[in-house]
Every structure is written in structure tokens, then in C-alpha cells.
Amino acid sequence: MQRSLGSLAGMATSAFGAGTSAAMRQATSPKTILEYIINFFTCGGVRRKNEAQYQELIDTMADTLKSSMPDRGAPLPENIILDDMDGCRVEFNLPGENNEAEQVIVRVSKGDHSETREIPLVSFEKICRVLLFRYEFSIPQDSVMLTAQGGMNLKGAVLTGANLTAENLCGTDLSDADLGGAVLFMADCDGANFKGANLSGASLGDSNLMNACLEHSIMCGATLDRANLTGANLQYTSLLGCSMVECLCSGANMDHANISGATLIRADMSGATLQSATIMAADMEGAILTRANLRKASFISTNLDGADLAEANLNNTCFKDCTLTDLRTEDARMSTSTQTLFNEFYSENI
């Protein structure tokens, strides 16, 4: 079946104007009754052909951008041409001398016939940057370039040892990605999804991880000094041996996290929840845990010298062989067992 110009124009518009999973599904689904019939009797043959064409568009665009730009941060060309796409020419005209509109004009032509569409410049630029990012770090191109929220789709990407210093990763989906040993110093990861990702040995100092999802991620030996984890989700996260000096974890959810061997000197964990968290041989000198929920958390051989647990929830919290010199516990809620423990073993230090 020969693809119509309108169909190819619509496909290009979906790929480079939206770039989401929903847009891909809509663009590659059968459109006419005939296509639905053929798709049915070929067990999805029409959709498979459309998906292959969609992926070819993306791969060709990535190659074209890479060959026409000196680096990923350079301005996009005003005119981008993809030749021989199913026998057609696909042209993208960005706003400039040849395009006074504020939109990107997509023109698909073959012989004397052509079809045009318009797509938002902001979306087009964002998608092109995703293609270039994937190209630079040797990540295979994916037909889904953006998340439904407009962040980069880098799910499952292999970025071991990658230098992502000061990179803008806001809203990026990096779930199940491998970032072992990667450098994300001062990276902006606001709202990013790192669920199940490997961040062992990664450098995240001074990074912005506000509202990021790090649930079930592995961060053994990572550096998070002065990182902003306000409101982040760190449930079931492994933070073994992490350096989190002066880290801001206010309001973070760290339930069931393993923070053993971590350094949290002067970390601000006010209002955080660490229910059933395991904290063994950690250094939390001067840490701020005011209003934190530490219910059923286990502190073993941990240094809490000068820590502030005022108004914290200490119901059924375990403290064993800990240093609690100058610990503040004003208005903290304690279960009878925890109160007895403090009265019998730590009363002179508080």
C-alpha cells in the first residue's frame, strides 16, 4: 500500500509535535475501513508497517540533525529536509527568514503534490534535543521520545559513567536506567523518575532532585552532598554508604529505605518520613529531624550527636548502641518502650 501524503504528514506531526506514546499509537493505527480489514487479516500488518515508518522518520531525523549541527547545544537549522521517506520529501521549516509564523511548518511533497501541517516550535525543539541526547550517549532511538508530562523518555537507558554535569533532566523518565558512576553534579532533576534505577557511585552533589521519584533505586556509595531532595520519594531505596552531607531532605518519603553507613552530617530531614527505615552505623551528627516520622525506624550504632528530633514521631523506634549526646527530643511522641529506653540508657545524654 502506498502511503498518502496526508498520512505521512500526520505521522511527522505526531512524531515531532507530540512525541508521546499516545501520539505514536494514534499515528500508527489503521485509518480507513480498508486498512482495518487488511490489518485484521494480516494480524496487525498495517500497524507494524506504520510503526516501522514512524521509527524510520525518527532515525532519519536524528541522523540529519547530527550531521547538520556542530554539537547538541547549537541552534537548530532553520530548514531540515528528510529525503526519500517512502518516496516522499519531508521538510521542516522553523520560524525565521523563510517562515514568519511562530510554528514549525511541516511540508510533505511528492512530484507536484504536497501536504502541510503546523506543529509547536517548543515541542519540536524539545523532541529534537531528545534525539540528539540519545545520539550523543549512544542510546538507541525510541518511537516514544517524551513522557505524557513532556519530559524526556530515557527509560532503561544505559548511562554508566556519563558526564551529565548541570544537565536539565526535569521531568525525565529514567526509570530502570543504569547511571552507575555517572556525574550529575548540579544537574536539574526536578520531578525526574529514577524508579528502580542504578545510581551506585553516582555523583549528585548540589543537584536538584525536588519531587523526584527514587523509589526502589540503588544508590550505594553515591554522593549527594548539598543535594535538594525536598519532597522526593525514596521508599525502599538503598542508600548504603552514601555521602549526604548538608543534604536537604525536607518532606522526603524515605519509608523502608536502607541508610546504613551513610553520612548525613547536618542534613535537613525535617518533616521527612522514615517509617521502618534501617539506619546502621550512619553519621547523623547535627541532623535536623524535627517533625519527622521515625515510627518503627531502626537506629543501630549511629551517631546522632546534636541531632534535633523535636516533635518527631518516635513510636516503636529502636535506638541501639547510638551516640545521642545533646540530642533534642522536645515534644517528641514516644511509645512506652522507646520512652523507657531513653530513660534507662540515654537520659544523661539528652
Walk through the language-model features, giving the residues of each.
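Compositionally biased, intrinsically disordered low-complexity segments
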Residues: S14, G19, R25, Y36, ...
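Membrane-engaging insertion elements
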Residues: G19-L34, V46-S68
